[in-house]
């Protein structure tokens, strides 16, 4: 896996799924391919994106700044600086300085990532802040190692909380989660339908599922009543895909 592919993988792992994620993936690909060279416009676009947490915006801003060539005097952006200040915790800053000294002696991406993984996400973000604010310099490879370690720490905690939700025995949460997934699958079916001949059928199935979810939410139902809803929808989606000759395993 190339270095930039690895960076893109880690960064996208902390962006919530949805149309915005696809848009960010496209921007990262363009930046890494040297197709997008207007850093100021890119940062302005990033600053105004909804949904993203300040830290995710900070990390993306750091990656864009590292990658896009810019004039030396270009102003640092406040929204990135604020996100990478380790929540203003002096302990994070102390650890960030110690980490920076170690990274300064490192020259490889994997070496830097290995060192950084033993620090907390707060200390890692503060260390990125030091580099972003030009208080310290490391090689681009080392900076990318720091980025990937930070994303791995964040993705790990997201995965833990996601797993807790998936394995929860609370029937109300499981019921709501099934309905949310059914709605998301319905939306995916509508997007895939496009202008094909079978589109009407797909739209019909998706529309029925949406109406059912809305009705369930409006009148309130027993938590076990949604058990088959998502499975039925996925079955319909897969049957539709087979007829279309499309295989999109990611909806499983």
Swiss-Prot record:
- GO BP terms in the entry: viral budding from plasma membrane
MF GO annotations = RNA binding; structural constituent of virion
Q: Which SUPFAM superfamilies match?
A: Influenza virus matrix protein M1
Give the UniProt keywords, A-Z.
Answer: Host nucleus, Membrane, RNA-binding, Viral matrix protein, Virion
What Pfam family is a match, any one? Flu_M1_C
Q: Where is this region: Membrane-binding?
A: 1-164
Main subcellular location: virion
What sections of the protein cross the membrane? none
Positions of region (RNP-binding): 165-252
**Compartment list:** Virion membrane; Host nucleus
Q: Anything else the record notes?
A: Most abundant protein in virion. When expressed alone can form virus-like particles in transfected cells.
Q: How does the annotation summarize its subunit structure?
A: Homodimer and homomultimer. Interacts with NEP. Binds ribonucleocapsid by both interacting with genomic RNA and NP protein. May interact with HA and NA. Cannot bind NP without genomic RNA.
Q: Which family does it belong to?
A: Belongs to the influenza viruses Matrix protein M1 family.
Q: Which function does this protein serve?
A: Plays critical roles in virus replication, from virus entry and uncoating to assembly and budding of the virus particle. M1 binding to ribonucleocapsids (RNPs) in nucleus seems to inhibit viral transcription. Interaction of viral NEP with M1-RNP is thought to promote nuclear export of the complex, which is targeted to the virion assembly site at the apical plasma membrane in polarized epithelial cells. Interactions with NA and HA may bring M1, a non-raft-associated protein, into lipid rafts. Forms a continuous shell on the inner side of the lipid bilayer in virion, where it binds the RNP.
Q: What name is this protein filed under?
A: Matrix protein 1
């Amino acid at each position: 896996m190339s270095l930039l592919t690895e960076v893109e993988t880690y960064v996208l792992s902390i962006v919530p799924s949805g149309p915005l994620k696809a848009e960010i993936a496209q921007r990262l690909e363009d930046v890494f391919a040297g197709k997008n060279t207007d850093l100021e416009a890119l940062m302005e676009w990033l600053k105004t994106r909804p949904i993203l947490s300040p830290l995710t915006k900070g990390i993306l801003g750091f990656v864009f700044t590292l990658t896009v060539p810019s004039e030396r005097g270009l102003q640092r952006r406040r929204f990135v600086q604020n996100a990478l200040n380790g929540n203003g915790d002096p302990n994070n800053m102390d650890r960030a300085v110690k980490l920076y000294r170690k990274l300064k002696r490192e020259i490889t991406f994997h070496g830097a990532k290995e060192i950084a993984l033993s620090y907390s996400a707060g200390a890692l973000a503060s260390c990125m802040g030091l580099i972003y604010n030009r208080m310290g310099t490391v090689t681009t490879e080392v900076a990318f190692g720091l980025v990937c370690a930070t994303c791995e720490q964040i993705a790990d905690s997201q995965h833990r909380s996601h797993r807790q939700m998936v394995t929860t025995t609370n029937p109300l949460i499981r019921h709501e989660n099934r309905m949310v997934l059914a709605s998301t699958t319905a939306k995916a079916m509508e997007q895939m339908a496009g202008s094909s001949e079978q589109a009407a059928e797909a739209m019909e199935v998706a529309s029925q599922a949406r109406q059912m979810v809305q009705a369930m939410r409006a009148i309130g139902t027993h938590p076990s009543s949604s058990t088959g809803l998502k499975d039925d929808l996925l079955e319909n989606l897969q049957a539709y895909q087979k007829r279309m000759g499309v295989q999109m395993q990611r909806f499983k």
